[in-house]
C-alpha cells in the first residue's frame, strides 16, 4: 500500500507553521544506556513511521484488523528508542497530529528526551499530487506544490531534520524542464534552511526508468545529491540493480531499507536484500538506512526482522 493512497485524508488538516529558527537537539541531557555507542551499527539505522502506518489513524486501512493500541507521533521517539534502541527517525507528513508551533515544540522536546534525531520527512501532501505536481507544465499548479513543500521545509528546519522528501509527481521524460525548475527552487530554499530536498524512486517514471531521476539531479545542479534510493520500489530485479547503481552516487542523507517478507531464517524473500546493501557500500554511501516495513503480519515483528537483516549486512 502506497502512502499517496492516504493523501486525501490529510487535506485541510494542517495549518501553516510559524517560521522558527532550527535548533540542534540539546546536548546537555544525561547519557542513556540505550544509546548506541561508537561503532554500533544502530547509529546508521533509522525507523520510519510508515513501518507502523496501520497504527496511525490517518493511514490505517479501513479493513485493517491488526490488534493493539493506536499510535501518536509524540510517543514515537520514546517507543522506538525503548523497543529497538534506534535513535534516528523518519516522520511521514500525514502522521503529524498538528503543525501548530506548540505541537512542534512538544515534538522537538520528545525527540530530545529520547536522545533521538529526525533524519527525513517524507512529504506526502495533496499539493504534490494535484495534476502533475512538481512536474506539471502549468505554473499555477506547480506553484501550489512548491508552496506546500516549502511549508514542510520550514517544519523540518524547526525540528532539525536533515532532509525532506518531495515526490516529483508525473515526470515526463520528454520534458523535464518543469520538474527541474521546481527542484531548483526547492533546493535553494532548503539550502537556506539547512535542509536537503531529496527524491525517492516512489513509483512511476522514477521506479521504472531511474535514469530519468539522474537526468533530473544533473539538471538541478552538479552539487545536487538528492536521491533517496528505496530497495524495493522497482518493477523487477534487473531494474532494481541498475537503478540502485544509478541512484546511490547521488544519495548522501538516507535510503530506505525495505522489509516485505521473510523466511524462517529471517531472510528477505521478495528481493535480494544483500545485493542492495552491497551496491550501497560500493557506491560509498555514508548515510542512514531507514527501515520501512511494508509486509503482511505484525509490523512490530516485521520491523525487528528488517532490523536484524540490516544489522547482519551493514
Short names for language-model regions:
Residues 2-158, 174, 191, 222, ...:
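N-terminal pre-domain/capping segments
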Residues 59, 88-89, 173, 177-279:
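Acidic/histidine-rich catalytic cores of soluble enzymes
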Residues 116, 195, 283-287:
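A short helix->loop->beta-strand "cap" motif at the edges of active sites that frequently abuts
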Residues 89, 164, 255, 288-289:
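Hydrophobic residues within beta-strands of alpha/beta enzymes
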Residues 49, 167-168:
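Flexible, glycine-rich active-site loops centered on histidine and acidic residues
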Residues 290-294:
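Short acidic/histidine-rich active-site segments
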